[in-house]
Amino acid sequence: MINAKTKVIGLIGHPVEHSFSPIMHNAAFKDKGLNYVYVAFDVLPENLKYVIDGAKALGIVGFNVTIPHKIEIMKYLDEIDKDAQLIGAVNTIKIEDGKAIGYNTDGIGARMALEEEIGRVKDKNIVIYGAGGAARAVAFELAKDNNIIIANRTVEKAEALAKEIAEKLNKKFGEEVKFSGLDVDLDGVDIIINATPIGMYPNIDVEPIVKAEKLREDMVVMDLIYNPLETVLLKEAKKVNAKTINGLGMLIYQGAVAFKIWTGVEPNIEVMKNAIIDKITK
Protein backbone atom coordinates (compact mmCIF):
# COMPACT_ATOMS: atom_id res chain seq x y z
CA MET A 1 0.00 0.00 0.00
CA ILE A 2 1.49 3.34 -1.08
CA ASN A 3 1.15 6.00 1.63
CA ALA A 4 2.88 9.15 2.88
CA LYS A 5 5.78 7.09 4.26
CA THR A 6 6.50 5.13 1.06
CA LYS A 7 10.12 5.40 -0.10
CA VAL A 8 10.65 5.90 -3.83
CA ILE A 9 13.35 4.26 -5.93
CA GLY A 10 13.59 4.97 -9.65
CA LEU A 11 15.07 3.72 -12.88
CA ILE A 12 16.59 6.41 -15.10
CA GLY A 13 17.33 5.77 -18.75
CA HIS A 14 16.09 6.44 -22.28
CA PRO A 15 14.08 4.50 -23.31
CA VAL A 16 12.76 2.68 -20.21
CA GLU A 17 9.33 1.39 -21.19
CA HIS A 18 10.79 -2.06 -22.03
CA SER A 19 12.22 -2.50 -18.52
CA PHE A 20 11.23 -5.35 -16.21
CA SER A 21 13.01 -3.76 -13.23
CA PRO A 22 9.83 -2.20 -11.73
CA ILE A 23 8.04 -5.57 -11.83
CA MET A 24 10.97 -7.39 -10.24
CA HIS A 25 11.74 -4.86 -7.49
CA ASN A 26 8.14 -4.13 -6.53
CA ALA A 27 7.51 -7.88 -6.14
CA ALA A 28 10.63 -8.14 -3.94
CA PHE A 29 9.60 -5.13 -1.79
CA LYS A 30 6.15 -6.66 -1.26
CA ASP A 31 7.64 -10.06 -0.43
CA LYS A 32 9.86 -8.52 2.27
CA GLY A 33 7.11 -6.25 3.62
CA LEU A 34 9.10 -3.10 2.76
CA ASN A 35 7.27 0.19 2.20
CA TYR A 36 9.07 1.07 -1.03
CA VAL A 37 7.93 1.61 -4.61
CA TYR A 38 10.05 1.37 -7.78
CA VAL A 39 9.18 3.61 -10.73
CA ALA A 40 10.71 4.01 -14.22
CA PHE A 41 11.64 7.56 -15.32
CA ASP A 42 12.35 8.21 -19.00
CA VAL A 43 15.15 10.81 -18.81
CA LEU A 44 16.43 12.46 -21.98
CA PRO A 45 20.22 13.04 -22.06
CA GLU A 46 19.78 16.83 -21.92
CA ASN A 47 17.80 16.50 -18.66
CA LEU A 48 20.21 14.19 -16.84
CA LYS A 49 21.92 17.11 -15.09
CA TYR A 50 18.70 17.88 -13.16
CA VAL A 51 18.07 14.36 -11.85
CA ILE A 52 20.20 14.17 -8.69
CA ASP A 53 19.26 17.58 -7.29
CA GLY A 54 15.61 16.89 -8.14
CA ALA A 55 15.75 13.50 -6.42
CA LYS A 56 17.31 14.99 -3.29
CA ALA A 57 14.62 17.69 -3.23
CA LEU A 58 11.87 15.06 -3.55
CA GLY A 59 13.36 12.62 -1.04
CA ILE A 60 13.87 9.82 -3.58
CA VAL A 61 16.20 7.30 -1.93
CA GLY A 62 17.86 5.61 -4.90
CA PHE A 63 18.04 4.76 -8.57
CA ASN A 64 19.09 2.21 -11.11
CA VAL A 65 20.78 3.76 -14.13
CA THR A 66 20.49 2.26 -17.59
CA ILE A 67 21.38 3.11 -21.22
CA PRO A 68 22.51 5.77 -22.12
CA HIS A 69 23.33 7.38 -18.74
CA LYS A 70 25.68 4.95 -16.92
CA ILE A 71 28.86 6.94 -17.61
CA GLU A 72 27.47 10.47 -17.87
CA ILE A 73 25.66 10.30 -14.49
CA MET A 74 28.98 9.99 -12.63
CA LYS A 75 29.79 13.70 -12.87
CA TYR A 76 26.66 14.56 -10.86
CA LEU A 77 27.32 12.21 -7.91
CA ASP A 78 28.83 13.12 -4.52
CA GLU A 79 30.71 9.84 -4.04
CA ILE A 80 31.52 6.81 -6.18
CA ASP A 81 32.24 3.34 -4.82
CA LYS A 82 35.72 2.00 -5.68
CA ASP A 83 34.42 -0.74 -8.01
CA ALA A 84 32.30 1.75 -9.95
CA GLN A 85 35.32 4.10 -10.14
CA LEU A 86 37.42 1.28 -11.55
CA ILE A 87 34.75 0.35 -14.10
CA GLY A 88 34.03 3.97 -14.98
CA ALA A 89 30.25 3.44 -15.01
CA VAL A 90 27.44 3.52 -12.45
CA ASN A 91 24.21 1.50 -12.55
CA THR A 92 23.02 1.96 -8.95
CA ILE A 93 22.69 5.10 -6.82
CA LYS A 94 21.82 5.40 -3.14
CA ILE A 95 20.82 8.80 -1.76
CA GLU A 96 21.45 9.03 1.97
CA ASP A 97 22.03 12.02 4.28
CA GLY A 98 21.93 14.36 1.29
CA LYS A 99 24.65 12.46 -0.58
CA ALA A 100 24.24 10.58 -3.86
CA ILE A 101 26.59 7.58 -3.93
CA GLY A 102 27.21 5.58 -7.11
CA TYR A 103 27.80 1.83 -7.33
CA ASN A 104 28.09 -0.73 -10.10
CA THR A 105 26.38 -4.10 -9.73
CA ASP A 106 26.43 -5.06 -13.43
CA GLY A 107 29.79 -6.86 -13.43
CA ILE A 108 29.12 -9.03 -10.40
CA GLY A 109 25.55 -9.62 -11.64
CA ALA A 110 26.87 -10.92 -14.98
CA ARG A 111 29.41 -13.17 -13.27
CA MET A 112 26.78 -14.61 -10.92
CA ALA A 113 24.43 -15.30 -13.85
CA LEU A 114 27.20 -16.93 -15.90
CA GLU A 115 28.50 -19.06 -13.04
CA GLU A 116 25.00 -20.19 -12.09
CA GLU A 117 24.77 -21.76 -15.56
CA ILE A 118 28.30 -23.08 -16.20
CA GLY A 119 30.16 -23.09 -12.87
CA ARG A 120 33.34 -21.16 -12.04
CA VAL A 121 34.50 -18.87 -14.84
CA LYS A 122 38.29 -18.74 -14.67
CA ASP A 123 41.11 -18.89 -17.25
CA LYS A 124 38.60 -18.71 -20.12
CA ASN A 125 38.94 -16.88 -23.43
CA ILE A 126 36.04 -14.44 -23.58
CA VAL A 127 34.88 -12.02 -26.29
CA ILE A 128 32.73 -9.12 -25.11
CA TYR A 129 30.86 -7.22 -27.83
CA GLY A 130 30.41 -3.54 -27.00
CA ALA A 131 32.36 -0.84 -25.18
CA GLY A 132 29.58 1.04 -23.35
CA GLY A 133 28.58 1.02 -19.69
CA ALA A 134 27.42 -2.62 -19.45
CA ALA A 135 30.39 -3.88 -21.49
CA ARG A 136 32.80 -1.99 -19.24
CA ALA A 137 31.35 -3.51 -16.07
CA VAL A 138 31.36 -7.08 -17.39
CA ALA A 139 34.82 -6.74 -18.93
CA PHE A 140 36.42 -5.35 -15.75
CA GLU A 141 34.84 -8.13 -13.67
CA LEU A 142 35.74 -11.03 -15.98
CA ALA A 143 39.21 -9.72 -16.88
CA LYS A 144 40.27 -10.29 -13.25
CA ASP A 145 40.77 -14.02 -13.93
CA ASN A 146 40.13 -14.57 -17.67
CA ASN A 147 41.52 -13.49 -21.05
CA ILE A 148 39.31 -10.85 -22.65
CA ILE A 149 38.83 -9.46 -26.16
CA ILE A 150 36.78 -6.27 -26.46
CA ALA A 151 35.05 -6.22 -29.87
CA ASN A 152 33.32 -3.03 -30.96
CA ARG A 153 32.07 -1.41 -34.16
CA THR A 154 34.22 1.64 -33.37
CA VAL A 155 37.61 -0.05 -33.00
CA GLU A 156 39.16 2.98 -31.29
CA LYS A 157 36.68 2.62 -28.41
CA ALA A 158 37.51 -1.09 -28.09
CA GLU A 159 41.23 -0.29 -28.01
CA ALA A 160 40.79 2.47 -25.41
CA LEU A 161 38.74 0.20 -23.13
CA ALA A 162 41.14 -2.74 -23.52
CA LYS A 163 44.12 -0.50 -22.67
CA GLU A 164 42.30 0.93 -19.65
CA ILE A 165 41.42 -2.55 -18.32
CA ALA A 166 44.98 -3.81 -18.82
CA GLU A 167 46.41 -0.77 -17.03
CA LYS A 168 43.98 -0.72 -14.08
CA LEU A 169 44.05 -4.50 -13.50
CA ASN A 170 47.76 -4.87 -14.26
CA LYS A 171 47.15 -7.26 -17.18
CA LYS A 172 49.22 -7.72 -20.35
CA PHE A 173 47.73 -5.59 -23.14
CA GLY A 174 47.71 -7.56 -26.40
CA GLU A 175 47.85 -10.89 -24.54
CA GLU A 176 45.46 -11.09 -21.56
CA VAL A 177 43.39 -8.13 -22.77
CA LYS A 178 42.95 -7.52 -26.52
CA PHE A 179 40.67 -5.53 -28.82
CA SER A 180 39.05 -6.00 -32.22
CA GLY A 181 36.33 -4.82 -34.57
CA LEU A 182 33.07 -6.78 -34.71
CA ASP A 183 34.63 -9.29 -37.14
CA VAL A 184 36.73 -10.80 -34.32
CA ASP A 185 38.26 -14.25 -34.86
CA LEU A 186 36.43 -16.68 -32.55
CA ASP A 187 38.91 -19.58 -32.84
CA GLY A 188 39.77 -20.77 -29.32
CA VAL A 189 37.11 -18.57 -27.73
CA ASP A 190 35.11 -20.21 -24.91
CA ILE A 191 32.48 -17.58 -24.15
CA ILE A 192 30.99 -14.70 -26.13
CA ILE A 193 28.89 -12.00 -24.47
CA ASN A 194 26.74 -9.44 -26.26
CA ALA A 195 26.80 -6.20 -24.25
CA THR A 196 25.39 -4.06 -27.08
CA PRO A 197 21.70 -3.17 -27.60
CA ILE A 198 21.69 -5.10 -30.93
CA GLY A 199 18.57 -7.28 -30.88
CA MET A 200 16.84 -5.48 -28.00
CA TYR A 201 13.09 -4.79 -28.11
CA PRO A 202 11.60 -3.23 -30.22
CA ASN A 203 14.33 -3.85 -32.85
CA ILE A 204 14.28 -7.62 -32.48
CA ASP A 205 14.68 -8.62 -36.14
CA VAL A 206 18.03 -6.99 -36.83
CA GLU A 207 21.15 -8.68 -38.18
CA PRO A 208 22.75 -10.64 -35.29
CA ILE A 209 26.12 -9.47 -34.01
CA VAL A 210 27.52 -12.94 -34.85
CA LYS A 211 26.15 -15.45 -37.36
CA ALA A 212 25.83 -19.19 -36.68
CA GLU A 213 28.69 -20.09 -39.05
CA LYS A 214 31.18 -18.41 -36.69
CA LEU A 215 29.82 -20.20 -33.60
CA ARG A 216 30.59 -23.70 -32.27
CA GLU A 217 28.74 -26.24 -30.16
CA ASP A 218 31.39 -26.06 -27.40
CA MET A 219 30.90 -22.29 -26.93
CA VAL A 220 28.83 -20.45 -24.36
CA VAL A 221 26.84 -17.58 -25.89
CA MET A 222 25.46 -15.01 -23.45
CA ASP A 223 23.31 -12.02 -24.35
CA LEU A 224 22.81 -9.32 -21.71
CA ILE A 225 19.50 -8.39 -23.37
CA TYR A 226 16.46 -9.78 -21.54
CA ASN A 227 13.67 -8.43 -23.75
CA PRO A 228 13.22 -10.57 -25.83
CA LEU A 229 14.50 -13.55 -23.83
CA GLU A 230 15.58 -15.24 -27.06
CA THR A 231 17.47 -12.65 -29.09
CA VAL A 232 18.63 -12.98 -32.70
CA LEU A 233 22.09 -13.88 -31.36
CA LEU A 234 20.76 -16.68 -29.15
CA LYS A 235 18.72 -18.03 -32.08
CA GLU A 236 21.94 -18.21 -34.12
CA ALA A 237 23.71 -19.99 -31.23
CA LYS A 238 20.93 -22.58 -31.00
CA LYS A 239 21.48 -23.48 -34.67
CA VAL A 240 24.87 -24.96 -33.68
CA ASN A 241 23.66 -26.30 -30.29
CA ALA A 242 25.85 -23.88 -28.33
CA LYS A 243 24.99 -23.25 -24.67
CA THR A 244 22.87 -20.09 -24.50
CA ILE A 245 22.29 -17.70 -21.58
CA ASN A 246 19.83 -14.81 -21.82
CA GLY A 247 19.99 -11.55 -19.88
CA LEU A 248 17.42 -12.50 -17.26
CA GLY A 249 19.95 -13.89 -14.77
CA MET A 250 22.16 -10.81 -14.93
CA LEU A 251 19.12 -8.53 -14.57
CA ILE A 252 18.02 -10.40 -11.45
CA TYR A 253 21.45 -10.70 -9.81
CA GLN A 254 22.54 -7.10 -10.45
CA GLY A 255 19.10 -6.09 -9.15
CA ALA A 256 19.46 -8.22 -6.02
CA VAL A 257 22.80 -6.60 -5.17
CA ALA A 258 21.28 -3.12 -5.75
CA PHE A 259 18.24 -4.04 -3.60
CA LYS A 260 20.57 -4.84 -0.69
CA ILE A 261 22.44 -1.52 -1.18
CA TRP A 262 19.16 0.46 -0.96
CA THR A 263 17.40 -1.46 1.80
CA GLY A 264 20.02 -3.44 3.72
CA VAL A 265 17.83 -6.51 3.11
CA GLU A 266 18.61 -9.58 0.96
CA PRO A 267 15.77 -10.06 -1.54
CA ASN A 268 14.26 -13.40 -2.50
CA ILE A 269 15.79 -14.21 -5.91
CA GLU A 270 12.98 -16.63 -6.80
CA VAL A 271 10.32 -13.98 -6.15
CA MET A 272 12.16 -11.56 -8.48
CA LYS A 273 12.57 -14.21 -11.18
CA ASN A 274 8.97 -15.44 -11.01
CA ALA A 275 7.59 -11.88 -11.22
CA ILE A 276 9.43 -11.38 -14.52
CA ILE A 277 8.54 -14.80 -15.92
CA ASP A 278 4.86 -14.17 -15.07
CA LYS A 279 5.02 -10.89 -16.99
CA ILE A 280 6.77 -12.43 -20.00
CA THR A 281 4.46 -15.43 -20.28
CA LYS A 282 1.19 -13.48 -19.95
Swiss-Prot record:
EC number(s) given by UniProt: 1.1.1.25
Binding positions (shikimate): 19-21, 66, 91, 106, 226
Pathway in which the depicted protein is active: Metabolic intermediate biosynthesis; chorismate biosynthesis; chorismate from D-erythrose 4-phosphate and phosphoenolpyruvate: step 4/7
Record's catalysed reaction(s): shikimate + NADP(+) = 3-dehydroshikimate + NADPH + H(+)
Main EC class the enzyme belongs to: oxidoreductase
Cell membrane found in the keyword field: no
GO molecular function, one term: shikimate 3-dehydrogenase (NADP+) activity
Family statement: Belongs to the shikimate dehydrogenase family.
UniProt function note: Involved in the biosynthesis of the chorismate, which leads to the biosynthesis of aromatic amino acids. Catalyzes the reversible NADPH linked reduction of 3-dehydroshikimate (DHSA) to yield shikimate (SA).
NCBIfam families, per the entry: aroE (TIGR00507), PRK00258.2-2 (NF001314), PRK00258.3-3 (NF001319)
Subunit text: Homodimer.
Protein name: Shikimate dehydrogenase (NADP(+))
Organism listed in the record: Methanocaldococcus jannaschii (strain ATCC 43067 / DSM 2661 / JAL-1 / JCM 10045 / NBRC 100440)
Organism ancestry: Archaea, Methanobacteriati, Methanobacteriota, Methanomada group, Methanococci
Gene name of the encoded protein: aroE
